Amino acid sequence: HATLRRQRQMCIRDRFSDIIANRQINRLWVVGSNNDTANLIDQSYKRYLSLMEKHLKCLPFMFGQRPSSSDFALYGQLTQLVGFDPTPRNIAYQISPRTVSWVNVMSDLSGLHDSGGIGEFFGVQSKKKDNNKLNYFEDNDYGWIDTNNIPDSLIEIFNEVGKVYIPCLIANAKAYEKGDEIWETSIDGALWKQKTFPYQAKCLKWIKMEFDKLSANDKKSTLDLISGSGCESILE
């Protein structure tokens, strides 16, 4: 009976394994992943890892000595690429061990409270002592990079995003506005074709809305930072 039970369990496991694998593989075209774009995706991922390796040699986080929302956004993607999928994980280990370590660090940024919290680790002095609030970074600009002295590594990351991802974001938004189910565009000399995603169109809209909320000086600082990278196109 025990042998039969194990055999049934293995059959069920294999069946669900095939179902899940086929479901994910068959959805690759939806996000633009196919034989035509494979090399583009592969090369961009490797370039990004090389740029991250360079950047993390100088700074522990994207914009300085403390994590920003951008760090957590990148972390969310990299948890899958570095910590789950074996193919991109192996590439990451070869090209950028610092990125692998960074993902692990980001996974354990706990303790944003007062005494002994991670705020003290970053050298940030809390202005309000309240153990019930994550208040170390409230109204505190400590640790951000000087916008007048942006590291080349960060500029190069923006350039990669502007070259590969921003054209996708813009083309998807235009297709969504027109009601097109599928769109295509040229990215770094390769044809990119995929299904239109409403969520990405909303993301682009949110970015513009948040940019419009900035003061005139902050808008100028932002544009100065990304000017020439291609990223400024999403704010037009």
Task: Give, region by region, the residue ranges found by the protein language model.
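Globin-like tetrapyrrole-binding proteins
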Residues: 28-29, 33
